[in-house]
Design a protein with these regions (language model features):
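Short, Lys/Arg-enriched N-terminal segments with co-localized hydrophobic residues
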Residues: 11-27
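Transmembrane alpha-helices and adjacent helix-loop boundaries
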Residues: 24-261
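Intrinsically disordered, low-complexity segments enriched in serine/proline and basic residues
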Residues: 1-10, 14
């Protein structure tokens, strides 16, 4: 009796397996095979031959490029925005010339692709890919930061500056102590969005052989014949952007609390 029941169970199991196979249902064996292949591919593109070190080096290059370019962009942006602000009401030839030069800079940089600017910086101005990247990304970001800051300054009520001057403050002190602190609160979201965009724009640094995160991931993809490194790079970029967004929201909350306080 037991033998007959066991044989019947085997027949039912085989019939169910054939039915699942015919209907396209995944089997446990296929699941474990797929999982094993996935883990094997992950090992091949991360641990094998210490490739995780290459990801870290590429990540370090990406962060360094973005951080240095961000500093250059902020310096250029503040300078250009202040020049355009002060030169707007001046009638002298010198101020008009400087204002026109700043306007041309913003128009040209914003109107041409970053890849073209990067190639020009590498082939004409610099011999090293790192220096060319920092310069190109910084100059590119400066044009956008300048417009963001200029818009923030313009959003402040002119009466604020007049009140500062009525208190005996110089034009520079009024800008530094009254206008700019209020403008920063208004432009903070747009400024952080520009920094996030700058971080992602560094992914084209590989055009001039800079081994950033994207370039390293693509190199490993070519060696391992596997597209997983590109997904790993995408996940790392996503984590960086999420982190920057969290910092932005925290700063906005603190500024809001200081306003209420």
């Amino acid at each position: 009796m037991r033998t007959a029941r066991a044989a019947r169970a085997v027949q039912l199991s085989g019939a169910c397996g054939r039915a699942n196979k015919e209907r396209g249902y995944p089997s446990v064996e296929n699941f474990w095979n797929d999982l094993n292949k996935l883990l094997s591919d992950f090992y091949k593109v991360t641990v094998y031959k210490g490739r995780w070190v290459q990801y870290l080096e590429g990540l370090g290059m990406t962060i360094a490029l973005a951080a240095l370019a961000c500093q250059i962009g902020v310096c250029i942006g503040v300078l250009v925005a202040l020049v355009k602000y002060y030169a707007g009401g001046k009638k002298s030839f010198g101020w008009k010339t400087v204002n026109a030069a700043c306007g041309i800079y913003v128009t040209v940089i914003r109107g041409t692709p970053i890849v073209v600017q990067l190639l020009i910086a590498y082939t004409i101005l610099f011999n090293g890919s790192f220096e060319a990247c920092v310069f190109a990304f910084g100059v590119n970001s400066g044009a956008y930061v300048a417009e963001i800051i200029r818009g923030g300054i313009a959003s402040i009520d002119p009466g604020q500056a007049e009140a500062g001057r009525s208190l005996g403050l110089s034009e520079g002190a009024t800008m530094r102590l009254i206008v700019l602190p209020q403008a920063v609160k208004n432009i903070l979201p747009a400024l952080f969005n520009e920094f996030i965009a700058l971080l992602k724009e560094t992914s084209v640094a590989g055009y001039i052989a800079a081994r950033d995160l994207t370039k390293v991931s693509d190199s490993i993809r070519g060696i391992a014949f596997n597209s997983a490194p590109l997904f790993i790079a995408a996940a790392i970029y996503l984590l960086l952007v999420v982190g920057m967004t969290a910092i932005q929201k925290k700063m906005e909350r603190r500024l809001a609390q200081s306003d209420r306080g």
